[in-house]
Amino acid sequence: MKALTVISFVAVALIALTVPVAAQGQLNDADREFVNKAAIGNVAEIELGRVATQRAARPSVRSFAERMVTDHGENNAELTTLARSKGIDVSSTLDTTHQAMRDRLSGLSGADFDRAYMSEMVRDHTEDVALFEREAQSASDADVKAYAARSLPTLRGHLALARQVNSEVTLGPTVVPSAMAAAVIVPWCQGAYAPTAGTNFGNCAPAK
């Protein structure tokens, strides 16, 4: 009888130890869907950016595309590590929608390419910011929530820059006084704030 009691105690202890570990590696459906969408978005920005570095006419469009390849590549590496820790294998290939966009862009060049690519970048990043804002507020998993919050400043910077370059390719460059140049280059720094030199998107400091 005593032996059975000891065995039962050990079994209960093992269950108590293993259940939390398993739970830590699981995501609810909403968080899992977010991780998958974020991965698809990263792959799309990387692949479309690579096309743009080869086919864009304006230097500003090529520069934007290079930034997308770099930033989304770094973000996707972080996301892939997070996903694996949660038992998820994220996609590393384009989804049907973005594959069709890639095929379309590959058939364009010059000003036509610039307009089509930048229009897509504004649309994609508008959706990305909304998606990440929701997850940063409502994610159930703490790690996923933190990842979404960390990514937001860069995504907001991408959206602001995409809008700026898109305006340039559709309407032409805007000429402004030199004193306003910083605000145009980094329009997401608002009010009494100015861009911090040598920092990534989304970093602002009080203006001196």
Give residue spans per PLM region.
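His/Met- and acidic-residue-enriched segments that coordinate or traffic transition-metal cofactors
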Residues: A3-F9, A16-K208
